[in-house]
Each structure stands twice: as structure tokens, then as C-alpha cells.
From Swiss-Prot:
Ribosomal protein keyword on record: no
Gene Ontology CC terms, in alphabetical order: membrane
UniProt entry keywords in alphabetical sequence: Glycoprotein, Heme, Iron, Membrane, Metal-binding, Monooxygenase, Oxidoreductase, Transmembrane, Transmembrane helix
Gene Ontology biological-process entries: secondary metabolic process
Membrane-topology descriptor: Single-pass membrane protein
Localization annotation: Membrane
Molecular functions per Gene Ontology: heme binding; iron ion binding; monooxygenase activity; oxidoreductase activity, acting on paired donors, with incorporation or reduction of molecular oxygen
Originating gene: eqxH
Its EC number(s): 1.-.-.-
Record-annotated membrane-spanning stretches: 13-32
Family according to the record: Belongs to the cytochrome P450 family.
Protein name: Cytochrome P450 monooxygenase eqxH
A Pfam short name: p450
Length: 513
């Protein structure tokens, strides 16, 4: 008997299946307690099905088409859907302006739950409000003085990761860009010494990739089963190992850092450091430095790498953009230097980035909120307390929101910007960092991404280096295809780039910052 039990426990998939089967027998049909029962359900479970596991898995594998179906069926009215984020009420985008600052709609609780921060190893996904405070209070205010360090680190990272070879060579863009953005972000967050610690850079990049991939795997299981399932999943164990390795990597570095700070204090000298280690110490009474740094890295690395990759793909498919983008960089940086204000004047680049994000935002569902009390919608309907709402992002590429909405147009938001500048009082939100109900790439409302200003600067600096120093094209004339996985809209990870060093028109490494 014990031998059979040992065999079961040694087989993770069998153990998981048994566990789910046992627990499912005790699950009461959740539909009896639906908080949004007055809305039609897009993908109901079968009459004899105990759980929604099948329909959720179908949603995960075909979410983009299902959300388009919901949009077509319910025509601007709220509806329910069984998703990898649980049962949600999908609200139409025309409701967003009225709800964007609603005090009873909370982002933190559903974000924490959907990111599995209750599972050991996923602590860096904790949507702590103090993180937003750190970003707004320290990082955003430091933008002007970090452009130089960001550019310096970008130069080293591109040379290390992409190489200076003038010959065409093939790269896998996702891991390459993860390393580059990790280095750039860590330069600001952790300082020059630590950002060049290859062990830390690798661990931060590995944790980002592993945790998001494992999170996707966990969403294949019912929410109630995940606190049990994670014990058996090798990927969850790997996430925990990487987090512990990150802690072990930082400990000796922090000890040396603290000794230097203590020595400076004893001499009556100011603290020699001004980066996120100090920011967190000022804002938190107690915190785990590795978790805090990985929290910042998750926010900075994943979404920034994602948008950089998509933009590089789009430029490769529209090579006519290369010359005007390079001309803009040379004109702006040669006259204004590498400053925050100069980056704001890279208007075509800003438009290309925003257009890339419009056509493939990181999520198929934005404005994720939990009703903390009954909330009245603009049409008079009442969302009951405890209901999770979300807005599909499919309208971002719809002709209802944008002319020729399904086509890439790198000049789209530049034209809007120029029109806005000539028409006083008109606001079309053409800037990359300006969220609107028509463009949810950085979220919307009170909980729009607080790090978007830093991300925009980091992206522009990375693109300045790449455009000036490299030629690139898609390998084997590939056409990148995004893929949906539940509420996540992923880039094409199979597409490779051919890239080579070129002679730049402007030596960006010599531009004054």
C-alpha cells in the first residue's frame, strides 16, 4: 500500500489530478452564488458539469476570439465571462471615464490574487501601494538625472548582448532584450556596481521569465486548487529556488554596502548612495530587499521588454520608418543633448511606440477592479460588492476607435499630436504616457501604471542606441504573430532577428546628458 502511495506522490501530474478530483467533490456549484447573475454569461459550463474548469481552459486557449464574440453578441452592454481571472463582468469602454476614479473599485486585491502572490515564491508580485509611492516619489522625480546613466548602461549592454559585429547574425530577441533592459533598469534601481553583477542580472531576468510562465501554468488549474497544486509543480519549485538564489546573491553585496554607509556616517559624510535600496528603507519599516528589487524588476523588465520587442518587430516590417526615426534622433539629440526634455521631443518615436502598444497591449483585459461596495454603472445597473470587473482591450484596434484600426500606422499619434498643438483645448491623448479610454496600454484611471514615465524614457534611450548603431530585419522573412493565453497577449517568441552593426550618424555615447 505504501509503495503505491509513494508512486502516486512521485508522479506530480497524477497527484494533482487526484487532489483536484477529491476537492471538486466538495465544491458547491459557484453559479448559485453568482454576484452578476443579471448579466448574460458568454461561456457557461454544461448542465452536468460541477466546475468551470473546462470552459476556463477553453477561454485560456481561445480568449481573443471569445472576447471578440462577446463584443459582437452583447453590443456595448456588460456581460459575464469565465476566465483565467475567475468570473468577471466585462464592461464596455464607454463606461471607463465615469468609473476611472471610483473610490469603491479596488485594483490591488484582484491584481494580487491573479498574480498568485499568496503562493510561496510569488511574493514579488505583491501589489504593495508603497511601491507606487516609491516610484512616484523617487523614480519619476529622478528622470532627468538618470538619462545619462541609462544611456551609458544601454551602450555597454547592447555591445555585450548584441555585439559590434558588422556581419549579419541571428539573435533571439526576447532573451536579448530581457538582458539589456535588466541591465538598464538595474543601473537606476541598484547602482553601477550591482547592475553589472552578472549573477544578479541573470537571476532577475530568469525570475521574471520563470514567474510569468509559471503563473500562466497555474491559471490552467481552478483558483481554489492552486494553494495545493503549487506543491507538486516543478515550475513553482524552480521559481522558489530562483527567489532564494536572488536573496543569497544580494546578502553579501548589501553587507558591504551597509559597511560603506556606516563608515561614511562615522566620518560625518552624507550617504554615498541614492537608489532604490535607500528609497525602500525610507518608505518601509521592514522589507525583504530581494523581494523589493524583484518587484521593481517585474514592473520594469517585463512590460518594457515586451513593448521594445513589439516595436522592433514593427519597424522591421515597416523599414521606411528607419530613415525618419534616425533623422529625428540626430536632429533632437545634437541640439538638445540627452535630456528628459529631448526625449519628449522624439515625437515620431513616441508615436511608433504608442502605435505598437495599441495593436498589441500586454493584456486582453484592462481596468481590472474589484467592487468593494455596490457600484452604480453609467447605465444605471448596479455592480454588486465582491464582483470583479474588467474591460476588454479589443476596442483599441477597432475601427470604432481609430481609422483603419487594424493596420499599423507609425505616424498615427504624431498626426494627432500635431493637430492637438494647432487646436487649442483639444485633448486626444497622443503621447505614449497619456492613458485614455481608447488606449489602455498603461492602464487607466487612478491605477494607471505609475512607472510609465520611466519606462517611456528607458524605451526611447534603448531605441536611440539600436536605431543609430544597428540595422535589423526579420529572419527568414517571418511575419510575427501575437498569441493569446487567457488575458495575456504575448509577442511572437519564435520570430528571430538578423542584425548587424552600422556606422552611426551621431555618436550617442558622446552626447551630453
Amino acid at each position: 500500500m505504501s509503495t503505491k502511495l509513494d508512486t502516486i506522490l512521485e508522479n506530480p501530474q497524477y497527484a494533482i489530478l487526484c487532489g483536484i478530483t477529491v476537492f471538486t467533490l466538495f465544491i458547491v456549484q459557484l453559479s448559485l452564488f453568482d454576484r452578476g447573475r443579471n448579466y448574460p454569461l458568454l461561456n457557461p459550463k454544461g448542465s452536468f458539469e460541477i466546475s468551470t474548469n473546462r470552459v476556463v481552459r477553453e477561454f485560456i486557449s481561445d480568449s481573443r476570439n471569445l472576447l471578440e464574440k462577446g463584443k459582437s453578441l452583447f453590443k456595448g452592454q456588460p456581460y459575464r465571462a469565465n476566465t483565467d481571472w475567475g468570473e468577471v463582468v466585462v464592461i464596455p469602454p464607454q463606461f471607463l471615464d465615469a468609473l476611472k476614479s471610483h473610490k469603491d473599485l479596488d485594483f490591488t486585491i484582484p491584481a494580487q490574487d491573479d498574480s498568485h502572490c499568496y503562493i510561496p515564491g510569488f511574493e514579488p508580485f505583491d501589489a504593495d501601494p508603497n511601491l507606487s509611492k516609491v516610484v512616484i516619489k523617487y523614480l519619476t522625480k529622478a528622470l532627468n538625472r538618470v538619462t545619462g546613466p541609462l544611456s551609458e548602461e544601454a551602450s555597454i549592454a547592447f555591445r555585450t548582448v548584441i555585439s559590434d559585429s558588422p556581419e549579419w547574425h541571428e539573435i533571439q530577441p526576447q532573451p536579448a532584450f530581457v538582458r539589456i533592459i535588466s541591465r538598464m533598469s538595474s543601473r537606476v534601481f541598484m547602482g553601477e556596481e550591482l547592475c553589472r553583477n552578472e549573477e544578479w542580472v541573470k537571476l532577475a531576468g530568469d525570475y521574471t521569465v520563470q514567474s510569468f510562465k509559471t503563473g500562466d501554468e497555474l491559471r490552467m488549474y481552478p483558483r481554489w486548487s492552486r494553494p495545493f497544486v503549487h506543491h507538486f509543480l516543478p515550475s513553482c519549485k524552480e521559481v522558489r529556488r530562483t527567489l532564494n538564489a536572488a536573496r543569497n546573491c544580494l546578502n553579501p553585496l548589501l553587507e558591504r554596502r551597509n559597511a560603506i554607509k556606516a563608515e561614511a556616517k562615522a566620518k560625518g559624510e552624507p550617504c554615498p548612495y541614492d537608489n532604490s535600496f535607500e528609497w525602500f528603507e525610507k518608505e518601509y519599516s521592514t522589507h525583504d530587499p530581494a523581494v523589493a528589487q524583484l518587484n521593481l524588476s517585474l514592473v520594469a523588465i517585463h512590460t518594457t521588454t515586451d513593448l521594445l520587442m513589439e516595436t522592433v518587430f514593427n519597424i522591421a516590417q515597416h523599414p521606411e520608418l528607419l530613415a525618419p526615426l534616425r533623422e529625428e534622433i540626430v536632429r533632437v539629440l545634437s541640439t538638445e543633448g540627452l535630456k528628459k526634455t529631448a526625449l519628449l521631443n522624439l515625437k515620431l518615436m513616441d508615436s511608433v511606440l504608442k502605435e505598437s502598444q495599441r495593436l498589441r497591449p500586454a493584456l486582453l483585459g484592462s481596468f481590472r477592479r474589484l467592487a468593494m461596495a455596490d457600484v452604480t454603472l453609467p447605465n444605471g445597473d448596479v455592480i454588486k460588492k465582491g464582483t470583479k470587473i474588467v474591460c476588454s482591450t479589443s476596442h483599441m484596434w477597432s475601427a470604432d476607435s481609430h481609422e483603419s484600426g487594424e493596420e499599423f500606422d507609425g505616424y498615427r499619434f504624431l498626426r494627432m499630436r500635431e493637430k492637438e498643438e494647432t487646436e487649442q483645448g483639444k485633448t486626444s491623448h497622443p503621447h505614449l504616457v497619456s492613458p485614455s479610454s481608447d488606449h489602455l496600454g498603461f492602464g487607466f484611471g487612478n491605477h494607471a501604471c505609475p512607472g510609465r514615465f520611466f519606462a517611456a524614457n528607458e524605451l526611447k534611450i534603448a531605441l536611440c542606441h539600436m536605431l543609430l548603431k544597428y540595422d535589423w530585419k526579420l529572419a527568414k522573412d517571418a511575419v510575427p504573430r501575437s498569441a493569446s493565453f487567457g488575458m495575456i497577449l504575448m509577442p511572437d517568441l519564435r520570430t528571430k532577428l538578423l542584425i548587424r552593426r552600422r556606422s552611426e550618424e551621431l555618436d550617442i555615447d558622446s552626447v551630453e546628458s
